[in-house]
Curated annotation (Swiss-Prot):
Entry GO CC: cytoplasm
Positions of the catalytic residues: H65, H111 (proton acceptor)
UniProtKB keywords: ATP-binding, Cytoplasm, Ligase, Magnesium, Metal-binding, Nucleotide-binding, Purine biosynthesis
Organism of this sequence: Prochlorococcus marinus (strain NATL1A)
Binding site for Mg(2+) 2: D133, D284
Major site of localization recorded for this protein: cytoplasm
Protein name, per record: Phosphoribosylformylglycinamidine synthase subunit PurL
Keyword Cytoplasm on entry: yes
S-S pairs: none
Compartment(s) of residence: Cytoplasm
GO function term, MF aspect, one: ATP binding
Matches recorded under Pfam families: AIRS (PF00586), AIRS_C (PF02769), FGAR-AT_linker (PF18072)
Keyword Cytoplasm: yes
Binding site for ATP: Y68, K107, N537, G574
Length: 803
């Protein structure tokens, strides 16, 4: 449904006797983030003017954050079905079947705007919110990941944001006892005023009784459980649905305050309560608080809910109905339970130190009815709040935006000619050796080790973490059964998970960049030996009200759809965060890079056969799976210096069109990689990402302490292209001499069965000399000590912060 209204008639409309209200409509609409056309539509549905409480409820529920009014038409095209999918989009989290009576529950959410205002609490409550999404489904939380974006660390403000966000994530996750096992962090000037904080949660359940959120049972009691309700987080959903400005940066009351120790009790109490069989439906109170939980539970169950605010545990005296309804105080849940179970459940929750009250009941009439001080203060159709919400009409431009047309004109021919020992740097017209190019790339915070961040997280709590952060291309945790009655698998199984997005690529081509995000996530999972099974996505974009912004979002959704269909990784749900723009003091608006973060999960049948990225022993041979290094002048468009880290960080150019994404190639490479890992043919695996071949080899050397001898084939291609180009579905593996014969044999066998789109290329061998040596035609190209590589890579972020 699309709503529209002519401004010139609005004053006449609101002053008509039928829709007259006792408040200033214009100022109220501004406060709630609603349009005049929204107000007209609300009046049409109610056949009266809404009171002030009701308008506030519509304000949060019709915000982009809650109803996806700009993105819903695009999201419906995402693939959401598959053989393992048990619960897809629409519930608190997605659920997939991983066999042996076990289900994996997972989702990703953003807390971007709150983290810009108050980084510690904004990030901490982001963790708390995603954990509630997980255990509300009946699953025990087992892991967390995060995807973060900040402005350059040359700015003290960005350093402060980074420190605050990492501290908030660390504090909440560590205190609640859920390991933060991985993630990704990027830095770009577009995020200087608008950092991104995306948190992904995973949970394990071993019962068929998935707890859903749709209410049922006329007159069944509605139970409030958890923390008290205060004035923190007021209007958080509306705040998250508008661009950041100096005014909103100072809007600290819109940021919630979390209590991880109370959340820990809430987790245990809820999981215990679910086992009783008394809980009919459950919904956490996140964005829009009581308003959202009541309206969504009622709408999904096609019933109504009566809520008595006089019974809600209050943190502060004198709270109004409006404040109760819009508060986003943390660690709160709403249950529908079986009649007669109230006292038993009350004792259970009190034992865990939680507030618990019967605050309402399920109604036959499909409304959300709110009572305060003995009077009805709101009475609204549940579907109007949570289901039948407005959809914005946007005209999709039918041609590539001008900014991209200009970027796509760039070609590698515009770079200075390469020499055997280096290149002229366009940024300052000075010569730079290949050694220093590599060291400079490794010192860039987006590429460098994130050890300064990881070491603040407790990633070993629960004792199921198999791979420490940074050791492999994906995080891996052991699946440890919680129930003795389940049939046990013969081998120790695991779950691999990853979050991925090359935002520079998406900025320079939203379609290819988004396809690449899905493909890289699947490649990273395959690099540890995991079979990718499903994704959750977090679409972080700028304003869709601008034609370019909506085009970027549309192209990104199309790219995700294509890649998910090709790689058989359906979407189980996720989050959309729009209006990630910063209004500068001169009134110009700075949009972020479009950043569709892909959270992907995969299944490992035997965790004893996973691969890390470290070389394992000296003299192992180094191979590359995927597209080969070129040996002629004809360039493969699937590999390029365009949009590369080399181009941006060495030459200061963020331009060019990212490489073509060959999804059939990706699929073949992933399958081959998983099989050779399963058969024990390779000892290590690491995909080529930011910085291309040279950076990938350096990372393998740094993590292992071993060196490498790499011999580039004779080629007419540019040296920088061979060393630093990106793309091509390429993965480095290492194996012994005997294993190398097995690798070649297996590749030959599958070649006989069909057409291979990829090759395996021998590049060199692991050495014990503690040096990375790269040569071509007997000319030394790179000769760097591993300790120098390690010091540069490991200390880069710490040095930036403490400079």
């Amino acid at each position: 449904m699309t709503v529209s209204f002519e401004n010139k008639d609005f004053n006449q409309f609101i002053n008509s006797s039928k829709f007259l209200v006792e408040y200033d409509v214009m100022s109220a609409l501004k406060q709630e983030g609603l349009k005049q056309s929204d107000y007209v539509e609300i009046c049409r549905r109610l056949n009266r003017g809404p009171n002030r409480n009701e308008l506030g409820m519509f304000g949060v529920m019709w915000s982009e954050h809650c109803c996806y009014r700009n993105s819903r038409p695009l999201l419906k095209n995402l693939p959401t079905t598959g053989s393992r999918i048990l619960v897809g989009p629409g519930e608190n989290a997605g659920v997939v079947d991983i066999g042996f009576g076990q289900r994996l529950v997972f989702k990703i959410e953003s807390h971007n705007h709150p983290s810009a205002v108050e980084p510690f609490q904004g990030a901490a409550t982001g963790v708390g919110g995603i954990l509630r999404d997980i255990f509300t489904m009946g699953a025990r939380p087992i892991a967390l990941l995060n995807a973060l974006r900040f402005g350059p660390l040359d700015d003290e403000k960005n350093i402060s944001l980074l420190e605050g966000v990492v501290a908030g994530i660390s504090h909440y996750g560590n205190c609640v006892g859920v390991p933060t096992i991985g993630g990704e962090v990027g830095f770009d000037s577009s995020y200087s005023g608008n950092p991104l904080v995306n948190v992904m949660g995973l949970g394990l359940m071993e019962t068929e009784e998935i707890v859903c959120s749709g209410a049922s049972g006329i007159d069944f009691p509605v139970l409030y459980v958890g923390n008290t309700t205060g004035r923190d987080g007021m209007g958080g959903a509306s705040f998250a649905s508008s661009e950041l400005s100096k005014t909103s940066i100072d809007d600290r009351p819109a940021v919630q305050v979390g209590d991880p120790f109370l959340e820990k009790g809430l987790i245990e109490a809820c999981l215990e309560a679910f086992k009783t069989g008394y809980v009919i439906a459950a919904q956490d109170m996140g964005a829009a608080g009581l308003t959202c939980s009541c309206s969504e539970m009622a709408s999904k169950g096609e019933v109504g809910i009566e809520l008595n605010l006089d019974l809600v545990p209050a943190r502060e005296k004198g709270m109004t109905a409006y404040e109760f309804l819009l508060s986003e105080s943390q660690e709160r849940m709403l249950f529908v339970v079986k009649p007669g179970s109230e006292e038993e459940l009350r004792e259970l929750f009190i034992r865990w130190g939680l507030y618990v009250e019967v605050v309402g009941k399920v109604l036959k009439e499909k409304v959300v009815r709110v009572i305060h001080k003995g009077e009805v203060v709101a009475n609204l159709p549940a579907s109007a709040l949570a289901d039948d919400t407005p959809i914005e009409e946007h005209l999709l431009i039918n041609s590539t935006p001008e900014y991209l047309q200009e970027h796509w004109k760039w070609t590698e021919d515009l770079l200075p000619k390469t020499l055997d020992n280096g290149i002229i740097n366009i940024k300052n017209n000075l010569f730079i050796s290949w050694n220093n190019v590599l060291l400079d790339l490794l010192s860039m915070p987006s590429i460098a080790s994130k050890n300064w961040i990881y070491k603040q997280y407790d990633y070993q709590v629960q004792s199921n973490t198999v791979v420490s952060p940074g050791e492999a291309d994906a995080a891996v945790i052991r699946i440890r059964s919680q129930n003795d009655f389940l049939t046990k698998p013969k081998k120790d199984r695991g779950i691999a998970s990853v979050v991925d997005c090359n935002d520079r690529w998406v900025y320079l081509d939203p379609l290819r960049g988004s396809m690449s995000a899905v493909a890289e996530a699947a490649r990273n999972l395959s690099s540890v030996g995991a079979e990718p099974i499903a994704i959750t996505n977090n679409l972080n974009f700028s304003s869709p009200d601008k034609p370019v912004g909506f085009w970027q979002l549309s192209m990104s959704c199309e790219g995700i759809t294509k890649a998910c269909l090709a790689l058989s990784t359906p979407v189980t749900g996720g989050n959309v965060s729009l209006y990630n723009d910063t209004k500068l003091q001169n009134n110009t608006v700075l949009p972020i890079h479009p950043t569709p973060v892909i959270g992907m999960v995969g299944l490992i049948e035997d965790i004893n056969k996973i691969c890390k990225k470290s070389w394992v022993k000296a003299e192992d041979q180094i191979w590359m799976i995927g597209l080969p290094l070129e040996n002629n002048i004809n360039q493969d468009e699937r590999i390029s210096l365009s949009a590369s880290s080399f181009l941006e960080y060495i030459h200061g150019l963020k331009t060019g069109r990212p490489p073509e994404i060959d999804l059939n190639l990706e699929k073949q490479v992933h399958a081959f990689l998983r099989e050779v890992i399963k058969q024990g043919i390779v000892n290590s695996a690491h995909d080529l990402g930011d910085g291309g071949l040279a950076v990938a080899i350096a990372e393998c050397c740094i993590s292992s302490g071993y060196g490498a001898n790499i011999i580039l084939p004779p080629s007419q291609s540019r040296l920088d292209r061979l060393l630093f180009a990106e793309g091509g579905a390429r993965v480095l593996v290492s194996c012994s001499t005997d294993q190398s014969e097995e690798l070649k044999k297996y590749y030959k066998n599958i070649s006989l069965q069909g057409s291979n789109l990829f090759s395996i290329s021998h590049l060199g061998n692991v050495n014990n000399q503690k040096k990375l040596l790269v040569s071509q035609s007997n000319n030394t190209i790179i000769d760097v000590n591993i300790l120098d590589l390690k010091d540069t890579y490991k200390d880069a972020i710490h040095k930036k912060i403490t400079k």
